[in-house]
Amino acid sequence: MWVVPGAPLEQGAGWRIWYSQDGDADFRPQPVTVAKSQQPQPIDEEWNLLARLPEFHRRIGVLTVRLRQPDPAGPVYELSVPEAERGAPFRWRSLPAGVGQEGVTFLLASCFWRDDDKEGSYTAGVQELTRRWSPAFKLLAGDQLYADWPIGNTDLPAVEFYASRYAEYWGDALYRELLQTSPTFFVCDDHEFWNDFPERQIQVPRTWLPAERKITAQAGLDLYDRFQGCANPAPFRWYGFRIDPVSFFVVDSRSRRDPFNKQPRPPHFLPEEQWQDLERWVHQLTGPGVLLIGQPAFQKDGDWRDHSLSNFPEDYGRLWAVIEESLEGHTADGRPHDILVLSGDIHTGRFAVGRRGGLDAPEGVPELIASPASMIRPGSKEVEEPDYRFTVHHRGRATTWQVDRNPAAGVPFMTLANNVAAVRMGLGTNGRIRFELTLWQVRPYDSRSWWERFTGDPAPVGPVIELFRKEIELR
């Protein structure tokens, strides 16, 4: 039995716990017991067993555990889950209702290529950061597995292929230990399916023909929904949650992305219903917003090998218009509220700040990227710099943004080290929220050549160390 915590419930109400059992038979997990400071806590449970998927011979379900007497402060609870086969209970926080004197910490990570980290450096790093920071949750920002690399057995039916790749990752006890460190919010990016999804890729034979590409895409989506999406808040692929006064919105810019073809209409990276949810979220802000998106906002145009958000000019302009709406005060309380952007994808840990003339936004638009947790091979040899100046268009209006650049001062910060971010939110001055942003090395960058690898030169090793720290106060 595989057991992984999903997203916590808002207002400290409890948790979602994901289960997967081998075979086709129905099942229901044994009751969970919950304690706080070793005192038993009354709970209610709701079990949702997902429908069988043809050619997939595992059953998956989500157990919702609700505290009858929730503590809005988000303390640590001890959860005993019999199927997890642990000698000790899990120690998970509930989701705080608000940012208080103690603050709230969460982790951010993306891009885990297991083939280069089977020894578990990523797991050990997250375990160490969990001991240091006691995070309330973690945000996994995409590419939680690489379904497309290595290519694998191309003779397997699509569902069996994706199931086998998830079994390599979720079936790895070390990776499950990482997932079990704290409750988890998931969002997908391309490698849950294949590179630059939904585009045809020369190195992925399953994508060459339209009919097979459609079958493969549906299989990838079905397995993503079962292994990751079903453990999120509704509507599962994109969603929001709140830790008052901070509001989070998790954007899925991948699973419903249009193929990149400007005819007969411009392509989109978000469906209209997600746009409406995102715009409604901005208009309901009463404090800082945190926007998690699988690809960075400050990114140069990609090409046929890998498209960026900026390759979709209509949606890219609309995204920046949404951010401007918040900074201009088109919010629930009529005040301007800052947006912190979080992302992954680019195999560079990075912090950058964008600014637009005429906006009263002292902190600009800060963007923190945690990537990669484990670098794919062949991997990046140079850091991925942001687009330092770009113009977007929305409803006939052009706006130009500039990203702060001062190489002598290390601005923007960039690293190739395998990394994880920790973000701590606390009370700031004048009603603002202080965000302490840090990036941590979980494994050094491996710069060995193919020959050095072939001849057995050892991979670099190193401790968990802080690479970057920045404090900002957001309205």
Segment roles from a protein language model:
Residues 1-475:
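Metal-dependent phosphoester/phosphodiester hydrolase catalytic core
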